[in-house]
Amino acid sequence: MSDKGSRGEREDKSGAAIRDALRQIQAAVCDYKIVPDERPMIAAELRRMAKHADVVLTTGGTGVGPRDVTPEATRDVIEKELPGFAEAMRMESYKVTPRAIISRAMAGIHGKTLIVNLPGSPKAVAECLAVVLPAIPHTVELIRGEVVECARPTESNQ
């Protein structure tokens, strides 16, 4: 989410970082759009993308600036919040910078789609994706109803 990016005044390096990370794990990037920092426009775009995607990743607009409204737009759209995603991102990011506590990023479910807000800087995007990417496949399976039993027996708990 970026006013300047949506007007073509700034290169979207964070969006590129997301696409690069997804390509490295052979995930398909089926859509990409830069949306201005306008709550109704962000919410509409999240709903549109959720119609054909398992996961929607946003970048930017998660701070405390006057135009940072991505979490509010996400909250308008989701039916279930998944606070663990944002908590894990903030926890790991705090190890890098105390400014991580300013993040208002969130995650949740809209229909059968996982929506995750990522920070706006390419470096923070890479750090946060390293935290959440391992949990995304299982989360998507759960959202789709493909997992009937979460606990798999191991030798130690049989």
Where are these regions (language model features)?
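Non-catalytic beta/alpha edge segments that cap or flank active sites
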Residues: 1-158
